[in-house]
Every structure is written in structure tokens, then in C-alpha cells.
Amino acid sequence: MTITTSKQLPSLAQLPETYLIELSEFGAISLSGEEQSKYLQGQVTCDVNSITESNLLVGAHCDAKGKVFSVFRLINRSSAHLLLQPTASIEGSLKELKKFGVFAKVTIDIAEELGFIALIGKQASSLIQQEFSQVPDSLTPVVQIGSTSLVYLSGEQPRYIIIDDKATITAITEKLALPTYSQSVWNLLEITQGFPILTANTSGHYVPQMLNLQAINGISFTKGCYLGQETVARMQYLGKNKRALFCLNSQLEQPFQSDDVIEKQLGENWRKAGDILAHYQADDGSCVIQAILANDGDLPILRIASQADSVVTNQTLPYTLIAE
């Protein structure tokens, strides 16, 4: 039996009470070996030394200039570190990690054997309890039950990522028998929660603070040296960063195009306002957009360049930006 994934693209308000998301474009880089923690500590923004079997870290992997290859959620599974992230950002990050990994006792690879599904909504915790007898939460966000890893993500709608081999994930999905949506709906939730989504096209362009990593505990300023650390510290303590990640809303008459541009009004003219990282357009035309814009004052009047009559508004994120 195969998983039947709905092709519908509901708005946030139209999602059912409890549902699944097939994370078909989600994956993980695995690091294992005697020096896995020591090596990773020198490569990423979070404090790898603080990871345990039951906690979760957010972090970024940067180049020497502090530009971000990937943003990930770090967990431990079967004595290995897993960097959970969209598959679109894995290749570039993996290449760079392997480049320096040859000098350490560490094995670095894509966790190809794993499958991922997300359980979300009002009854999600009850279903997790029923199926696994233990529920991760804000205090213990990672739980290991046999071969299954359960990861809790807080938010207006708590999310649970279920990780196991692909056959087991399929079996769990069939047993739960809930409405199941595509990865696009996951992107909707990530955008509204202010969690940055990077692809091959946007990897290597932004420092962590432009992606709001400092606001979601994705940067340790006390851990010591890592690749790109000087740039990240300079941005934080010298107030060099003037851009931030925003969640924008619009109601569009036409489909949003991958090459669309956000414009700002300057008098009678319009100019590019910033960069679009990701978007989600529901079947009813409502659209949420993840964009990097100037953060040095009130947002100007915005529009989608290809749809001149569009109105773009700012949606408040569930966190505040730490003062630079």
C-alpha cells in the first residue's frame, strides 16, 4: 500500500484539526565516529557540546566568510548526529563538511535509509501517546522509542517529526489514516513560524543574522571558534547587519512565479525590496512569502512585481529580534 497525499493546498485556516505531512523533500546529514562532536563543533553556529539524546539544537553551517550553506535542526540518533534539513540544502553543505572531515575521525554522509513524516494538530500528542507511549515536549523535545525518533517542534500548532526507516514510516502513516499533505504545507508552517528555508539557489548568500538565527537560539556566542565565527560576531556586536527575515502575506489573482520579485514604493516609482527565499500559495490565492528585507525602519508599501495591483503586508513572527 502506498501513501495517498492530497494535492490540495489549503490556507492555514483551512487545515484540518489533525493531519500528516509527507516530508518527501526533507532529509538529514549524518555524522558519526570518534570525533563527530569535536569536528562538528568547529563547523556550525550552535554549541554541539550541549547536545544530548533528548534535546534539540537549531544551527547553521557557514563558509569562512560567515555565509550560510544550510540551516538545520540537530538531534542525536543511534550515537550519530543528524542535521535535519530540506534536501535542497543538503548537497552544498555535505560537500563542505566532507572537505574538512578528511582530517578528523568522522564519517559524514546523507542518511538515505531514513524516512520522515510530520504529525500536526489538536490530537497529535494523544495519537503519539497512543502509538508510542511517550510524547516529546518542550522540556524533552527528542524521544527515542525503539528504532523510532520523535521530535517535538513548538508553535501555535505543535509539530511532531517521526523518523524511522522508510517502510516503518509508511506503516505508521497507513495506521494513523489521517489527511496527508505534501511538503508544500510544511513550508507554509516553516514560513509562518519564521524558520528559514534555504535552497541550492539561496545557499551561501546570507549571514545567520539575516535569517534571524540569533532570535531562534541558532547561534552560540560563547562556544568559541567555528567556520565563519568572526563575521557572525562582528554582525552581532558592531551592528553591521541591516537585514532580517520576514513573513509576508498577499492575496493574489495569478499564480506566484518562482522568479517573482518583491518591490517597494519610492515616490511614484518601484524598486526591488529584497530577496524571496520561499513561498506558499493556497488554492484560494492567499500567499505567504518568506523574504529578506531591510530591517532599518518601518516597512514601505510592498507589492509583487508581476502583479501590479497586489498588496503585500507583514505578518508578525512568533519571536522578537534581539537588538543588534
Swiss-Prot record:
UniProt: folate binding residues: W186
Gene Ontology BP, a term: tRNA processing
Gene Ontology CC terms, in alphabetical order: cytoplasm
Matches recorded under Gene3D superfamilies: 2.40.30.160, 3.30.70.1630, Aminomethyltransferase beta-barrel domains (3.30.70.1400)
Entry GO MF terms: folic acid binding
Keywords: Cytoplasm, Folate-binding, tRNA processing
Pfam families: GCV_T, YgfZ_barrel
UniProt-listed InterPro entries: GCV_T_N, GcvT/YgfZ_C, tRNA-modifying_YgfZ, YgfZ/GcvT, YgfZ/GcvT_CS, YgfZ_barrel
Localization per Swiss-Prot or TrEMBL: Cytoplasm
SUPFAM superfamilies named in the record: Aminomethyltransferase beta-barrel domain, Folate-binding domain
Coiled coil: none
Task of the protein: Folate-binding protein involved in regulating the level of ATP-DnaA and in the modification of some tRNAs. It is probably a key factor in regulatory networks that act via tRNA modification, such as initiation of chromosomal replication.
Family (UniProt): Belongs to the tRNA-modifying YgfZ family.
Protein's name in the database: tRNA-modifying protein YgfZ
Protein species of origin: Colwellia psychrerythraea (strain 34H / ATCC BAA-681) (Vibrio psychroerythus)
